[in-house]
Amino acid sequence: MQLNSTEISELIKQRIAQFNVVSEAHNEGTIVSVSDGIIRVHGLADVMQGEMIALPGNRYAIALNLERDSVGAVVMGPYADLAEGMTVKCTGRILEVPVGRGLLGRVVNTLGAPIDGKGAIDNDGFSPIEVIAPGVIDRQSVDQPVQTGYKSVDAMIPIGRGQRELIIGDRQTGKTAMAIDAIINQRDSGIKCVYVAIGQKASTIANVVRKLEEHNALANTIVVVATASESAALQYLAPYAGCAMGEYFRDRGEDALIVYDDLSKQAVAYRQVSLLLRRPPGREAFPGDVFYLHSRLLERASRVSADYVERFTNGEVKGKTGSLTALPIIETQAGDVSAFVPTNVISITDGQIFLETNLFNSGIRPAVNPGISVSRVGGAAQTKIIKKLSGGIRTALAQYRELAAFSQFASDLDEATRKQLSHGQKVTELLKQKQYAPMSVAQQGLVLFAAERGFLNDVELAKIGSFEAALLAYADRDHAELMADINQSGNYNGEIEEKLKGLLETFKATQSW
């Protein structure tokens, strides 16, 4: 068989057309040093700040220091088997974590991988952990409440949806307990929760997860864990990962609550990473950008407008605002709120709940100091009934503290002063609350009404607790309709006032406590 020149040229053209050249250009570099979870890489020309660098063994590092002749990167995970001379590659991606409803009820690590043994997670996609916070135009003012279930917080330091409220205090003052109770109280409110545990013992986190499960709140919660045994890099990135998971709900017109427990440990982890990267230390050896570390995280907690949600969802969700409420926790040393990290976070947040060791040890729990605790925006979001009835509580406590200090030196007190002291003691006793026992709006309203209208005047101080328990049991049993109505509307008017007054008068006349 003979082929002429035309057929030969056609065959060659066909072969050339069918030939598939698959070429991938990798930007590669070489590890020149490994120490304490930090690698220095030579030869990465086009690496971005915060870019993921692929390491041998399906691991990643994040490029944090871009220097003239090398790149400083922090390894995400074990680094003992990394050695000089190993080849690494740029990925062209920044760190992303899985997001979506499939994460609810699950315990994940900083990278979004499940660590609860319940199998793979069905996520709705991935989101970068570092996102620019919504701008001023995209935000809406805070006017809906987040009920924590604590009388002292909801009455005196109310929290709104989209607010950042700091919980600050020494170790063992009930900071985590308050945050966990706030999460438990959201199980029927429709607010999705994210709990970020940073630098804690694995046993402590397991206990928290068990408590959430016992109180039917885990199904509504994502738990993000970076234990004390994990690398400093994973501890410092955990809050950003949790925030990205919470933003998924905010950007789709839903409400979410995120707890960072705690940002002091995150700042320490970031300080460790920065010092290992040889960045210049500043006050308390923290790097110069530790304020920015927390501000860019907490600014992402916001209430976004319906226009923002509609634009984000391409018109799928209309007329709904979304919110992400943050409860960051800071641990102080011997009550020193003027240290570097506490003052930073106080200045970033919209108020703080200050928990005191002395109050905690004297049996006042939650150990809230109403004098220096404040909510800067929550008042606009407070439920009507609680707003109306809680006005006198803060005043009564302030007068009581002043008089209590004065009465130590005075031998004889007039009748009016004695009454004020007695009322202050009873209000203080009334604001005590057990852990894992959040109260509904109606229950809080009833108790505050009793204090405000003088129904406690003839109740002995030692019997305040039993009086409250009996009153709530009676109201839930015999006046369930009224309680349900208050819970539903949160309103307070003349009719409700008369009903509450009648309820209390009947209770005191017919019941014992």
UniProtKB/Swiss-Prot annotation:
Annotated catalysed reactions: ATP + H2O + 4 H(+)(in) = ADP + phosphate + 5 H(+)(out)
Disulphide bond pairs: none
Residues holding ATP: 169-176
This protein's GO CC annotations: plasma membrane; proton-transporting ATP synthase complex
Location in the cell: Cell inner membrane
Annotated GO MF terms: ADP binding; ATP binding; proton-transporting ATP synthase activity, rotational mechanism
Record keyword Cell membrane present: yes
Site (Required for activity) location in chain: 373
UniProt xrefs under PROSITE patterns: ATPASE_ALPHA_BETA (PS00152)
EC code(s) of this entry: 7.1.2.2
Pfam families membership: ATP-synt_ab (PF00006), ATP-synt_ab_C (PF00306), ATP-synt_ab_N (PF02874)
UniProt keyword Ion transport, yes or no: yes
Membrane topology per record: Peripheral membrane protein
UniProt keyword list: ATP synthesis, ATP-binding, Cell inner membrane, Cell membrane, CF(1), Hydrogen ion transport, Ion transport, Membrane, Nucleotide-binding, Translocase, Transport
Assigned protein family: Belongs to the ATPase alpha/beta chains family.
Role this protein plays: Produces ATP from ADP in the presence of a proton gradient across the membrane. The alpha chain is a regulatory subunit.
Subunit structure: F-type ATPases have 2 components, CF(1) - the catalytic core - and CF(0) - the membrane proton channel. CF(1) has five subunits: alpha(3), beta(3), gamma(1), delta(1), epsilon(1). CF(0) has three main subunits: a(1), b(2) and c(9-12). The alpha and beta chains form an alternating ring which encloses part of the gamma chain. CF(1) is attached to CF(0) by a central stalk formed by the gamma and epsilon chains, while a peripheral stalk is formed by the delta and b chains.
Name of protein: ATP synthase subunit alpha
Organism of origin: Erwinia tasmaniensis (strain DSM 17950 / CFBP 7177 / CIP 109463 / NCPPB 4357 / Et1/99)
